[in-house]
Amino acid sequence: MKTTHFISGLMLVLLIILANCRNEVSDTEPEPGTPAGTTYLEPSPQRNGDAQAGYQYLIYGDFISSGIPLPVFKQVFGSNSPDDLGRTGDADGISYRFNVVTAANGVKVVTPTCLTCHAERLNGQVIVGLGSNTYDYTTDQAVTFQQADLAVQLFYGQNSPEWEAYYPASRAYQAIGPYILTKSRGVNPADKIFATLSAHRHADDLHWIDDQQFNVPLEAVPTDVPAWWLMKKKHALYYNGLGRGDFARLSSASGMLTLLDSAEARRIDDRFPDLMAWIRSLEAPAYPYPVDQALAAAGQVVFEKNCSKCHGKYNIPDEEYPNLLVDLPTVGTDPLLSQTYQTYPEYHTWYNGSWYALGDHKGQLLPNSGYVAPPLDGIWATAPYLHNGSVPTLEDLLNSPQRPAYWKRTFDNTEAEYDKVKVGWKYSVETSQADADTYDATLPGYRNQGHTFGDVLSAADRKALLEYLKTL
């Protein structure tokens, strides 16, 4: 249902901050011959944590402490969802996209959780750590929460403990709603969520302010949600390397959706090193279909000659990842996301003067011009490609002239929809954007330009490289 999707999807936006975080960082130095147009991203000290405790916090935790009262949620949405996580108690029968927590006043509420963002179905199975790629943010959902307000009032009234437990979530969702509209399904409007919440929070004690302190541009810039299993290699968060310092602190800002003040932020922050430790333990899923091993071996040679200086090496024991930021003229991909944090500095100025930037484990937001060349572990599972999800298959990524300007897929994420030849999603080429399920790569922010490095390869080398990428 639209309401269910929107509630869970807002957490998808909020917790995308986790998509590039990790508990420890590699101390790999850039190798000699680092490509021109790149900058090495230095590591930062990180806190350790208990991975198992982190997983329990992930599937039961109250980092979002306000939501729909449990009886209302069950009445409207039911409680017979598949048992994807094996949870017990109140969470049994609730979608993996939500947690059931006890609000500060004792009311049980259903809240969105990290897995709204960082879990997705692939071939019929929920893969924890795979970025969501099916969500639809193309309609303005602020009115949905106005309707939810009426439902909670009808059940309990505005003077009830249930309304008190629900209202902080409703208030935040309605503030965010106008800023998270996208023009195509499947992409994520994460660039605006934290900026909007920050505009409604005092920097020092983080309490809510009804009126915005600074203006936030209305237009959302699309992103593709990265996979969690890449995190263990990263030195910086976000596609443009914006997030520096303590990743647990940076990631704990997801609590800004509903937290009361900095005291609650501190409680959440104390638990996030455990969650980071669990995220760091994840491994990429293996390609589940046959691989031509001889062809893949030839592709490894192509990869290490043409790709490894930016994306790393994957042949143990020589595995390494260089942590490079590639400047815009070099990579050539759509520049809008990178430019966004430079064209309106109010958000990172707020953050760098806020509670989150204080103490021994502070975070910082340092805008860069360019994009991080990501690790490629499990790349077969992470279609569509580029930072904005504009390219449906790896074959299209490696041969830019064949990238479709308009393309459409089913969003079923079943085996029947997976293209084992081109490695990615089966799609139809369209002549225009007739509906939200059609990706329009002609729009600013959505363009499929750049990363043309595969164009110079022969057809035989591209085929071999494609086979090798299945093995990562």
Where are these regions (language model features)?
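Bacterial N-terminal signal peptides that target proteins for export
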Residues: 1-10
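C-terminal motif of bacterial Sec signal peptides marking the signal peptidase cleavage site
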Residues: 17-20
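Periplasmic c-type cytochrome electron-transfer domains
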Residues: 22-472
